[in-house]
Amino acid sequence: GLENRIEYNLVDVVEGNCRLKQAMITDKRCPYLYLLPTAQTRDKSAISPEQMIKLVDEIKADPENYDYILLDCPAGIEQGFQNAIVAADRALVVTTPEVSAIRDADRIVGLLDANGLKDREDLIVNRIRMDMVNRGEMMSIADVNDILQLNVIGAVPDDENIVVATNKGQPLVGDSSMAGQAYMNICHRILGEDVPFLDLNGKGGFFKKLSSLFKGDKKN
């Protein structure tokens, strides 16, 4: 819901057209969260890996204002992907429990390994529908983990509240919905907290067992 407030973007910063803080956008609902938008009308090659590293280092040099830097990586493995991972020290691989998505995620993990992020990757499985899992029509979290062999840090249900929040331009983190709780739990786990997984099955115990199963289970 912040797109109408964009004046400058990431490319403007690296090209020296504005200062970093001029391009940062804040939201009164999340006063400590800053958004640095990318350029929608410029090619991904407008920024080099070296420029991305320099930009991230500039943000890191101000720890009083910035605790974490989240680089939203574009789909695919083109220049935007390379720019994101070159400055990263940890990767959150987000996938859905579909065969094609898992195949793409496995390829991404291989590229992350080759770029120095091996054993610093965590997995978030998105858009889970437990009714389909129970009918054998969708891969379970365990199935996905068997293939990718990463530490599962989040499991997000396929929740219509996500669509509603996106269309309204409203944050879902902290919301009472299942997806909102799942997002908040991911935040806690990134901070190193031991948070049990939500029972997306609604029957108790399923994701609690997964929590102990996946904790520390990383790719060899």
Model features per residue range: what roles?
Residues N4-E7, P49, I102, M138, ...:
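Electropositive phosphate-/nucleotide-binding environments in soluble metabolic enzymes
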Residues G1-E64, V164-K168, V173:
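P-loop/Walker-type NTP enzyme "switch/lid" segment
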Residues A114-N220:
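C-terminal lobe/tail of nucleotide-utilizing enzymes
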Residues Q51-E64, Y68-D158, V163-V164:
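Conserved catalytic-core segment of NTP-binding enzymes
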Residues P49, P74, F81, L172, ...:
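Conserved phosphate/pyrophosphate-binding and hydrolysis machinery centered on Walker-type P-loop NTPases
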